Amino acid sequence: MPFISGRCYNPFKRKGRKTRMNLDGLLVVDKSEGMTSLDVVREIKARFSIKKAGHIGTLDPFATGVLPVVINEATKLVPFLKDDPKHYEGVLKIGEETDTDDLTGKMIRKGSGEHLSPDMIRTIFKSFIGRIRQVPPMYSAVKVNGKPLYRMARMGIEVERKEREIEIFDLQIEKIAFPMVYFKISCSKGTYIRSLARDIGREIGCGAHLVSLRRTQSGPFTIEQAIPLSKVKALQSEEALRSCLIPLKEALFDLPEMIGDDSLVRKVRYGKEMVARDLDPDTLPPFEEKQWLKMSSPEDGLVAILQSAIRRGEIGAVGPDRVVFRPIRVFQNEKTVRKEESI
């Protein structure tokens, strides 16, 4: 086979111009087993020559399910996106504890759970519902003194980890086929299901670890929206990929929306604050002081994320030059991108 070049062929690259694909949005991927969350992002970036991308939340390599991926301008949304509750379906194995708290690790403890009745197991599961303290696994991305725990774990070093408060909103056993327990859980962000499996095993008295985990929801993003990575990579056009993306404005579904006219859009794009004289109170949604709002226009879509300096009800009582909104994120649209590329 003849050598062509060291660069990968990109079917979307257009000759004669610098390519900047207008692909901005959030893609809900159904992650397959065996990949890291970063692997998913890298493959999508490479397949479509995307400049910026990232993932919201992390799934362990053995876990599957909902992994929201933000693309290009959507990377600016991450601090403002709602990412809990998290919903999972999992399988826990009673009688063995591992050093990773899942099936990929080495067994460090073995016990017999034959004395356990289904009612005893259900009672122990229920005891974990509510606000609880949890110690992250050694094999995790949590940093201690600037170093990820998993790197120290691979060197055989175990360090003390600080407990974290998390919340289990619901924990239901679906089936018990001893030693396997099939369950569903709804929890806050930052919850380690592996740690939960370990702690349940210790409470039972004979150890346990996680053998299967599938995330079915992350914040507002559900498994019904998720697309397997293989199908994403099989898409043959920019338009096909774009049709799979959740638009920026829709991803911020829970933020109050302000519609801006051309003059306000222009002002915000230059990073300027909006004062009382700029605004018609009758067109504004309710908002409190220091609240985030999204600003959009019919032509441009999402323009910016704003932070309010006062409450909506105060606008009529303040002077005309009183600052009402400050832009904290400004988004490019197709027209502004084309203008930049022509400079």
Where are the regions that the model predicts?
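Accessory RNA 3′-end/elbow-binding domains used by RNA modification enzymes
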Residues: 2-3, 8-32, 38-59, 63, ...
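RNA pseudouridine synthases
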Residues: 9-227, 231, 305
